[in-house]
Amino acid sequence: MTRRDVLLAGLVAVIWGINFVAIHVSLEHYPPLLLASLRFLVLAIPTILFVPRPRVRRRWLVGYGIGFGILQFAFLYLGMAAGMPAGLSSLVLQASAPFTVLLAAVFLRERPGLPVLIGVAVALSGLAVIAGYRGLAVSVVPVVLVLAGALGWAIGNICSRQAKPDSPFRFMMWMTVVPPVPLLALSLVVEGPEQITWALADAPGAWAANVGLAYTVVLATIVGSGIWTTLLARNSASSVAPFSMLVPVAGLGSAWLILSERPSGWELFGGVLIVAGVLGPYASNRVNRIRARTSFTRLRRPVEKEGWVRSELSGIRHSLER
């Protein structure tokens, strides 16, 4: 990955980390499955009317919508509504990174290099430190739900990688057409018409929940997912996916500042390990490229010097012959 792509991946991590606070605020008013449906419905309508369809196979577009859209956010929102804290949700969802590396190895035959494997191991150790400190305070069901959402994200990553869209932005926008109807149907079955009607009727007065929904739609979905899809289109899935582990650092920090979910020293230590695990492979590749460039320069200088000597000797010989 280039330095620019690394910075973009880091920016997406910050946007998505803060998004967990926005989701927490929105869930105080909207039922989880209805909220997930509204998230994509707001984008699906203008997409159908104004955005040209991307040139990709339909199965990969639908697969991306099911994995990244339906599975990830249905389970994530249900888990947070069941009591999963915003900061801890941002942490557990990052299991999508090792899930993606595993799925890419099985289905795409992508073999991650040793630096990537070491980086994933270090980042996972950071996740384990934070989860070990905070996990005892959370019941099993919310954790399992958010982990299921992480698997959905990984499935979406693989479908996006296979699609290879000509326009990642159009691909991401058309993905939003897939989730609204299935999520709304699930909301009708699970949450019931009465709860949906009440939430929509009182929506104009729920300004905080609406601001959170707007953040989720504009920044987290359009900006964040658009950049993420672009990165997956021009880099291997195993290179991009580990950057999702930076999300809990931003998630824990924003939850601390806004929701007063104060991280402990162990959580901060785990965050440092996550950052090191994500950036380690990139730093290793940079060092290797610098070493290779230096070695090439050292090898080239004697050759250039030898060529100069030969040129001088040839000139002297021609002078003597004259």
Regions found by a protein language model. Give the residues of each.
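Juxtamembrane helix-entry segments on the extracytoplasmic side of multipass membrane proteins
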Residues: 1-5, 29-33, 37, 54-58, ...
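Hydrophobic alpha-helical transmembrane segments of multi-pass membrane transport proteins
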Residues: 10-18, 22, 62-82, 103, ...
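Small-residue-rich packing faces within the transmembrane alpha-helices of Major Facilitator Superfamily
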Residues: 17, 37, 41-45, 124, ...
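Hydrophobic/aromatic residues within transmembrane alpha-helices
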Residues: 26, 35, 79, 106-108, ...
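Hydrophobic transmembrane alpha-helices of multi-pass small-molecule transport proteins
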Residues: 41, 47, 103, 112-132, ...
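Transmembrane alpha-helical segments that form core, pore/gating elements
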Residues: 43-47, 100-101, 137-199, 203, ...
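Cytoplasmic-side transmembrane-helix entry/capping segments in multi-pass membrane proteins
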Residues: 58-67, 112-123, 142-143, 166-176, ...
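Membrane-interface capping segments at transmembrane-helix boundaries
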Residues: 282-297
